[in-house]
C-alpha cells in the first residue's frame, strides 16, 4: 500500500553521441535564484554516456551561465557532481553505480544563509551527504543560474553529456530550501526510502 509514482520517463541517449531524448523548459521570467530545491528520482541504464569519460547531465541550465546536476564517469568513478555560480561545486564520495536501483536526489539551495554549509545541502535517499571529494559553497546571497529566463534541460547538457536512464517525479521548488521529507519517507516495515505525494507542494 501507500503512495506510488505512476510513471517515469526513459531517456535513451546512447546513439553515437547524439542527444535523442530530453525535456526542456524556458521560464517566461526569472524567479528566485538564491533559494530553491530540486528533487528527482533517478535510475541509471548505463554507467557511461555515448562516449567514455563524459558527464551525464541529469538537470541543468547552460544557456546563460551554468547550473548543472550531473553524473561523472572519471577517475573518481560514477559520482554525483554539481556545479553552479561563484565557485559552487560538490563532488560527492557516494557512488551511484547500481543500474537496478532508484536513487532519490535532493539539492536544497539557500545562499541567503550566513553559514556557508547551510547554503547548499545534498541528500540521497533521505540522508544528507557530508563526504565530498570537492566541497565548495557559494558566497552569501549569490544568485545561481537557475530559475532564470533561459533554456533549462532535463536529461541533456552538451552533445557529449546526455543522461541515460529513467527519471520520475522531477520537482523544482521556487523560493524554499526543503528537506527530503517533503518528497519521501522511510518505510516503517522495510526501512527503504520511498516517494510520497508531492502534489500539494
Task: Go through the PLM ranges and name each one.
Residues 1-16, 39-48, 65-141:
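Extracellular glycan-interaction surfaces
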Residues 1-7, 14-18, 114-116, 121, ...:
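Extended recognition patches within non-cytosolic domains
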Residues 12-36, 88-96, 157-159, 194-200:
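Short surface loop/edge beta-strand patches of beta-sandwich-type extracellular domains
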Residues 34, 48-55, 76, 114-118, ...:
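Short loop/turn segments at connectors of secondary-structure elements within structured domains
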Residues 34-45, 169-172:
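Beta-rich globular "head" domains
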Residues 38-39, 49-65, 122, 155, ...:
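Aromatic-rich beta-strand patches that line glycan-recognition/binding surfaces
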Residues 61-71, 195-201:
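Short, intrinsically disordered, charge-balanced linker/junction segments flanking boundaries
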Residues 88, 143-167:
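Extracellular glycan-interaction patches encoded by glycine-rich segments
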Amino acid at each position: 500500500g501507500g503512495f506510488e509514482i505512476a510513471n517515469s520517463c526513459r531517456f535513451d541517449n546512447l546513439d553515437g553521441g547524439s542527444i535523442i531524448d530530453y525535456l526542456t523548459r524556458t521560464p517566461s521570467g526569472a524567479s528566485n535564484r538564491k533559494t530553491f530545491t530540486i528533487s528527482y528520482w533517478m535510475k541509471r541504464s548505463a554507467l557511461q554516456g555515448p562516449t567514455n569519460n563524459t558527464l551525464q547531465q541529469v538537470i541543468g541550465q547552460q544557456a546563460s551561465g551554468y547550473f548543472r546536476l550531473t553524473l561523472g564517469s572519471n577517475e573518481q568513478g560514477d559520482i554525483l557532481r554539481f556545479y553552479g555560480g561563484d565557485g559552487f561545486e560538490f563532488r560527492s564520495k557516494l557512488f551511484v553505480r547500481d543500474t537496478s536501483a532508484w536513487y532519490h536526489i535532493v539539492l536544497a539551495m539557500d545562499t541567503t544563509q550566513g553559514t556557508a554549509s547551510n547554503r547548499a545541502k545534498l541528500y540521497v535517499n533521505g540522508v544528507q551527504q557530508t563526504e565530498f571529494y570537492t566541497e565548495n559553497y557559494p558566497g552569501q546571497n549569490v544568485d545561481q543560474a537557475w530559475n532564470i529566463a533561459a533554456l533549462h534541460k532535463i536529461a541533456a547538457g552538451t552533445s557529449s553529456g546526455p543522461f541515460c536512464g529513467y527519471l520520475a517525479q522531477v520537482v523544482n521548488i521556487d523560493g524554499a530550501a526543503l528537506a527530503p521529507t517533503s518528497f519521501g519517507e522511510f518505510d516503517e516495515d522495510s526501512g527503504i526510502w520511498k516517494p510520497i505525494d508531492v502534489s500539494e507542494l
